[in-house]
Amino acid sequence: MYKLFKKLPLIYILSIFIFILISSEHQYPQGWDELQSNEEWELVKKTDRVQISIKQLNVSPLPAFKAELISDVNSDKLAEAAWLVAKSTEVFPNAYIIDAGVYYKQGVTSYTAFQLFDIPFLSPRLYQFNSIRLGNSIHWNRADTISSSYNPDKILLPPVNFGSWEIQNLGHQSIIIYRVCTDPGGDIPIWIVEQANQRYLPLMLIDLETYANKKIVLY
């Protein structure tokens, strides 16, 4: 191992240690490894471009969802668009996000942020979460230590919320993989949430692709 490291450029070795340090500070929830595993997913919907699968995790009464889309858009552009949480209302115009922003940043690869959802016929939900970017992957988990002063109107806070964006190169194309486990809280029939996710997740991935293709410029 030592001989291998001697052959690597110093900047590459430093990047490895920085990656380990940053990822070790991010708090991962119970059920994270199960969400990321490719096993036991059940395909429930397939459009001409998007596949939706579900898996039941013990940490939520609702199934976790995985959405996948193959895109001609550059993977770096897609990841950059997914990282722009403050522009969520522009990136995801069909997601019923009415406000979003960053509470505070920890460097360029980590932030604590929020998204305010106002879905018709339901009470608004305020999602507060910690996000970390690892290359073209983004991991997030519900933030438990945010002051109540950031929620003066006492909007409902979902008790479970974690997931990831993963953008992979696929030859001359990219594949977007979105995984999420959430319990929005409140008295919502499970079947309504499941149907809503099956309807809006495909739109969300296509909206991400559209924004990345039209708005993101790589330097």
Language-model features: locations:
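N-terminal Sec-pathway targeting helices
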Residues: 2-12
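Eukaryotic helix-grip
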Residues: 26-219
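Bacterial N-terminal signal peptides
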Residues: 11-20
